[in-house]
Amino acid sequence: MTQLPYLLDRRGGALAAPATAWGDMMLNRALFSVALLSSVGSAWVVLSYACIKELRSYRHQLILGLAISDLLMSLNFMFSAGWNVAGGDLALEESRTACSVNGFLTQVFVVQTDWWILVIAIATYIILGNFKTQSQFIQTHVWIPWVGPWVLSIIIAAICHGVLGYGYIGGWCWLTSDLMRLLINFIPRWLIVIAIALIYIRLYMIVRKARKWDIEGVSPDPGDDMADTSVILMSVGKKDRERQGSGVLVSRDVSVSFGRKGSTAPTFVTMVTTSGAGDSREAISSCSAREEGSRARTVNVNSSRSLSLGMRQPLNAAQLKRIAKKMMVYPVAYAIIWACPTAIRIYQGTTGSRAPLWITIVDKSCIVIQGLVDAVVYGLNERAWQGWRDHIRRIIYKNEGGRIIG
C-alpha cells in the first residue's frame, strides 16, 4: 500500500528533524509564526533607534547591533520555514545549496547574538564601574565592539561549513549532529550566560550598596572599593533632545557618584544646561543638604551633552532597586529560553533517540523567539514608550516661532 506523502518516514534524517513530512510541516508553520514575531520585535528596536534621538546612546548603539543580528536571524528562519511551508524541501539533494547558505547564516547569527550579549554586558560594566580610561576608549572607538561579533561569528561559521557541513534539522539547516551543536554552540552560550550573570551580579551589588547608602545615609569607608563607583541611571546620547524656544530639554545622562565624602541627607541631582541653538556645555552639579565635619556626600552629574533645564531627579531607594532588578533580568531571560534546547541536545546526543514532535516544536521555538525576547528585555521600557509618544507629537504638531502649536 502506498503511503500518503504527509506520512512519509523521514527518520533517516537528523534527530532534530521530525520523523514524518506531516510533522515537519507542523513544525515549519509554527516556526514561521514565531520568527515573524521575532522579526517584528527586532524591527521595533531598529526603528526606535532610527526615529528617536533619545535612544541613540552608546549602549543603544550596541543594542542596535544585537537587534540587527536578531532581525537577520529571524528573516533567515522565516526563509527556511517559508520555503518548506510553500512546498519546498530543504532536506532534498536539489536544495543542497540553499540549505548550505541557510545553515551558514544560522550559524553566523546564533553565534553573533551570543557575542553581542556579552559585549553589551562588558560595556555596561565598564561604564557603570567607572573605568574612565576604558570607557572613554570604547565610546570613541564604536567600531571595535561592532567588528568583534561579526568577525568571530563568520570565522566560526566558515570553519563549521568546511569541516562539518550543514544539513536540514527540521525548520532550518544547521549542524546535523546534536553533539556537535552542543559542543560548538550551546556550551559556549552557557559560558557567556554565566559570564554576563557574574557581570550583572557585580553591578547589582554596586547599585544595592548605593541604595543602602541612600536609605541609611551612610557614606562609604574611604578604603571601600565601592567609594569611587558611579551608577549611571540614564545613558549619554549623541544629540540633545530639544524643543526650540520652549526651554525644554530632557535629561540624557545622570551619573550618581558616591565619593569619599558623605552626609546623612537625602540625595538628589540638579541638572542644568544651556538652551541656545548649538550651545552645549558640560553640566556639573553637586548637591548636599547637610555636612558633617569635613565629610560631605555629593552627587555629581557629568555630561558633555545638555541635561534638563532646572530639573531634579530624586535618587530614592525604589529607583535604585528597580535598576538593580532590571540588571538581573538579562542573564535570567537567556538562561530560561536556552534551557529546553540544551536539555534536548543532551538527550538526543547521548541517547540517539528522537524527541516527540511537540517537544521539538518547543525546542526550536525557544531558539527562534530570541529576537522577540531581546526586544522585550532591551527595547520595551518607559524611555522607549515616552520617546515614541514625543516623536508622534512632533509629527502631529508644528514648531513655529519657537513655540509648539497645534
Curated annotation (Swiss-Prot):
Name of the protein in its database record: Ascaroside receptor GPR2
Membrane spanning residue stretches: 30-50, 62-82, 108-128, 144-164, 186-206, 327-347, 357-377
MF GO annotations: G protein-coupled receptor activity
Gene ablation phenotype (knockout): Decreases cAMP levels following exposure to C.elegans. Decreases trap formation following exposure to C.elegans ascarosides ascr#3 and ascr#7.
InterPro entries for the chain: GCR1-cAMP_receptor (IPR022343), Glucose_rcpt_Git3_N (IPR023041), GPCR_2-like_7TM (IPR017981), GPCR_Rhodpsn_7TM (IPR017452), GPR1_C (IPR022596)
Recorded topology in the membrane: Multi-pass membrane protein
Family under the similarity heading: Belongs to the G-protein coupled receptor 1 family.
Keyword Membrane annotated: yes
Disulfides per UniProt: 99-173
Domain of life, per lineage: Eukaryota
Self-association and partners: Interacts with ascaroside receptor GPR3; may form a functional heterodimer. Interacts with guanine nucleotide-binding protein alpha GPA2; to activate adenylate cyclase and positively regulate nematode trap formation.
GO cellular component terms, A-Z: plasma membrane
Stated induction or repression of this protein's expression: Induced following nematode exposure.
Chain ranges on the Extracellular side, renumbered to this chain: 1-29, 83-107, 165-185, 348-356
Function: G protein-coupled receptor that senses nematode ascaroside pheromones and signals via adenylate cyclase to positively regulate trap formation for nematode capture.
Species whose genome carries this gene: Arthrobotrys oligospora (strain ATCC 24927 / CBS 115.81 / DSM 1491) (Nematode-trapping fungus)
Localization, UniProt: Cell membrane
